[in-house]
Amino acid sequence: MPQPLAQDQSRTLRSPQDLARAGLVAVDAVPGLEAVAARYATAITPAMAALINKDDPADPIGLQYIPDVAELITAPHELEDPTADAPFTPVKGVVHRYPDRALLKPLLACPVYCRFCFRREKVGPDGGLLTEAELQEAFAWFEANAAIREVILTGGDPLMLSARRLGEILGRLAGMAHIESLRIHTRVPVADPARITAALVAAVRQAKPVFIAVHANHAREFTPDAAGALARLADAGLPLLGQSVLLRGVNDDASAMEALLRAMLRNRIKPYYLHSLDAAPGTARFQVPEADGLALVAALRGRLPGHALPLFVCETPMGGGKKPVA
């Protein structure tokens, strides 16, 4: 059977009580946060908890991970499935929205749970792990669809799988003649860098190109431990791409965004996408108007080289996929 957690996660903060004991929320806030926890998962790894300034309620790391009762308020425009994955799911765990590529979601567990996640109604510590039969059905779908050139592993976070299981999945996909490349979307290198072991790196390396899309939203996430994890991936010849979400109070000014993108470059990450926030339930506090995002991107053009500028994108309605914000 697949094993989602290859290493000890016991020190991860997973409840309002854990957060209060760590000094990240007030004790009297716990009852209100219990209602949030009943709906949306919480997890803050030791690596991320250590970065949070407990004396600053607007700390950009804390904002990303500490739950807030505002999450229980759903705005009229917010959707449970804002990217419309469900209509494009031919078999469990697969999302096929573009002609030449498709997603594979082998599990729904993450090292941390972002408060703005567009899959927040689905992800959680139970893992949502595909059974062996479901995984074989997904493989059969990929084998039967020769137009697919790239498989994108997401979730959840694929690097939460054991090295053995991850290697098995990647190897099976890489063995399909029509698949030219693989991509893994992950927060693990910054959120839980100790997981990037030599065994995991060896499992990720395949006979076909494997791109690692690293999700990070603030320069402070690039700790020395994160830098070491990213170096282990880059030194193995794995191309690193950067993905971020434009978030109010986290990275929505030019200085913060410039620092983030420069941190990516220092760690051999090519900035790839800057996402406008998907309208998942209870995420309105993070929303940045697209006009403000465009102004931010314009301001960065005079401050950074072209290869440091990500493409600013948004999701189109009804599962139409990403498009540049214009």
Region locations from a protein language model:
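Short, charged beta->alpha transition segments
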Residues: T89-K92, A102-K105, Q136-F142
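C-terminal accessory regions of radical SAM enzymes
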Residues: A295-A326
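Canonical Radical SAM [4Fe-4S] cluster-binding loop centered on the CxxxCxxC motif
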Residues: H96-A133, I184
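Flexible, acidic/Gly-rich N-terminal and inter-domain linker regions that tether
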Residues: M1-H96
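Conserved, mostly hydrophobic/aromatic
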Residues: M48, C114, Y272
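Eukaryotic intrinsically disordered, low-complexity regions
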Residues: I152-T154
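Short clusters of hydrophobic/aromatic residues that line enzyme substrate/ligand-binding pockets
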Residues: I61, Y65, T83, I196, ...
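Conserved AdoMet/S-adenosylmethionine-binding subsite of the radical SAM
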Residues: Q136-E150, L159-L304
